[in-house]
From Swiss-Prot:
It comes from the Bacteria. SUPFAM superfamilies: SpoVG-like. GO terms for biological process: division septum assembly; sporulation resulting in formation of a cellular spore. This is Putative septation protein SpoVG. It comes from Clostridium botulinum (strain Eklund 17B / Type B). It holds the Pfam family SpoVG. Could be involved in septation. Belongs to the SpoVG family. The keyword rRNA-binding does not apply. Keywords: Cell cycle, Cell division, Septation.
Length: 92
């Protein structure tokens, strides 16, 4: 499965959540609401989730193979860095 599009839908400079992203696979399947989060060890992604009645968050969709997760994260963080760079250029 190939990542064919990454769309940074919302960018925030405040708080730990830095962006909300949609990723398209093979021009056929899209996953919305992936979050870019700033943690203690740098940026990472959080897959879309919902809150259970007990207050726990459960992923709605997520990769089950570590290599796939790393590939998705690398693509998203690369697109996020590019979007931030373009935003900085526009502000100058």
């Amino acid at each position: 499965m190939q990542i064919t599009d990454v769309r940074i839908r919302k960018i925030s400079s405040e708080g730990k959540m830095k962006a909300i992203v949609s990723v398209t696979f093979d021009n056929e399947f899209v996953v919305h609401d992936i979050k870019v989060i700033e943690g203690q060890n740098g940026l990472f992604i959080a897959m879309p989730s919902r809150k259970t009645p007990t207050g726990e968050f459960k992923d709605i969709a997520h990769p089950i193979v570590m290599d796939s997760r790393e590939k998705i994260q690398n693509e998203i963080l690369s697109a996020y860095a590019k979007a931030i760079e373009e935003q900085d250029v526009e502000e100058e």
